[in-house]
Amino acid sequence: MGKPRGRKLLKQQEKDQFKPAKEFDVPDEQDNFDGSNGTDSDPQMFFGVLDREELEYFKHAEATLSMDAFDNAEEKKQFVTNVIEETRGKELKLVISQICSKLMERLILDCDDQQLKSIFKAFNGVFYNLSCHKYASHVLETLLVRGAALVEKELLTPSFDGETDEESFITMENVYLYMLNEVKPHLKAMINHRYASHVLRLLILILASKNLPKTTQNNSTLRSKKSKIARKMIDIKDNDDFDRVHQTPESFKLELKDFLKNLYAGFTNGAASRSDISPTYVTKFRELCVDPVASPVIQLIIQVEGIFDRERSFWRLVFNTTDETDAKEEAFLEYLLSDPVGSHFLENVISFARTKFVERLYNLYMKPKITKLAQRDTTGAFVVQALLRHLKDKEVKEILEELVPQLSMLLNSNIDFGTSIIEASIKEDNYLRDEVINQLLVKYYPEQNENRNILESCLLLSSSTLGNTRDDWPTAEERRRSLFLEQLIGYDSKFVDVTIESMLKLPEERFLQMAYHGVFSHVVEHVLKPTIVDAIKRKLLLNVLCKDVVNMSCNAYGSHIVDKLWEFTAKLTLYKERIANSLLKESDKVKNSSYGKRVWRNWHLDQYVRKPMDWRRIVKEQDVAIFPNAQPLQPKNPLKRPKHTDLPPSKRKGVK
């Protein structure tokens, strides 16, 4: 058969090309794939409004709890109880109000166990509706976390003394199971719903006994960046039930298994095996993988499915498992590697997938073009970094061999690549270490450049916030670059030397400004290592730093540098005493500063004033601890030589 060409080839390529749907929330475009109907897509979310007096009362209650100016815990508890009594029968009206929903969250965080169950009961029948509401969904998330903590409490202490109320005998586990049965028919609609998807993610985390992240935590598996910023602005502080793993009963694992089983059946139309699934259903599920709302949910599903599904059904629904390439899968992978949402999806699923699955994707689709993928700064580069972390030694070395020669070029647009390659090299027994160091020096400290300065090339000092008088906060980019330079300093002593050389080339005022900078001061701290820096360079650094040691001691960032100087001046007693005397001369200023007090204590200056011999003993002990094999500068008992030893032999006899 002849090689396909012309129109036939173009048609085949167009047929295999992966093009996700532009809209994911329109039922007509999804047919019956997502199982949505009019009720699921637009559930009832209006439950009435409060009258003016009620609204004013609850606004005042929210403000009171926000200020938290109660005299004692008992007074606050009584206030919470009174407000909860006032909310009876009005809970649904409150949770759909922007201000009153914050009140409900505060009440849920501060209420007791029985009050928590009563709030759960008030939401019976409308849990799905609330999960789809902008404000009520946040209330529901807080309620679910507190409920998970109560489930754990009842699991560990099954009997409670003094419980006579009939409601007290209803366990939180049963309350939870009732709620889960209520939302189960709506799971597919929740996956790509703007608000309900967050509730679904939280439910999966709870059922799988995973860590429940804080509502303001960075890189959270639960909330979006926009949601975390809004959470910080309303100033509702999480309690101890967040940011931890809760023990759950066996019934929760069974519920999770049932959740995912029903979802899989819906996504595959009940197909018995992977080969029986219609390509249309596979394509539509892949479209959900690149949907900004649904993608994080599917990532979490793939992460937890291995708890009870050894076949990894959802992974196999997204990717094939054969050893041969597939045109449609190849097109899908190419889309993932060039799309921001898709690359984030692939990066995350790689991190918790079986190694053999990741190796297959790498060998079939990514290995031949790994350098090109690394050059896709906002997409494929992150996937390549994930491969370096999770592939086996052989594949990691292959990637390093391809990327290390290009490292200086890759760092132009993605400084994180340097971190990934350094860590991969260390993990592989310092594989290609010398070449990595040379590439980094070519990039940041080239020999042919007479004005080379790693602080400028790496930290971009001239365009930074260093020295600004407007109290500008250090930027995220400055923080990222500073951390990278700190990693280089710890990676090899060559970077310690070039960093110190660069610091000494700066004007003294500019160098001292680094000591007061919220980010760059950490770079200064990292080079103050007495065992790595030779005595001459230590003295050169100290000559500059000693000039402003008092002001540095009273600064939030500079005080850490002065603390470091205590060890950095080991075996340099004159410099140590010079710093101690400088602090002593302005002792009032130092002691009146909270940062200066710590410096005073860390430098043992009370002993220096009252018992100078004890202070010198501490200094000598430190010298021995840091330089145990150091030879004294002069022998304790030098041999006495006669004065005439330097005379010529002919004149020695006459000298006595």
Swiss-Prot record:
Annotated localization: Nucleus, Nucleolus
Mapped Pumilio repeat ranges: 86-121, 122-157, 182-217, 280-320, 328-363, 364-401, 505-542, 543-581
GO cellular component terms given for this protein: 90S preribosome; nucleolus; preribosome, small subunit precursor
Feature: compositional bias, Basic and acidic residues: 11-25
Extent of Basic residues compositional bias: 1-10
Record function comment: RNA-binding nucleolar protein required for pre-rRNA processing. Involved in production of 18S rRNA and assembly of small ribosomal subunit.
UniProt-recorded name of the protein: Nucleolar protein 9
Organism listed in the record: Zygosaccharomyces rouxii (strain ATCC 2623 / CBS 732 / NBRC 1130 / NCYC 568 / NRRL Y-229)
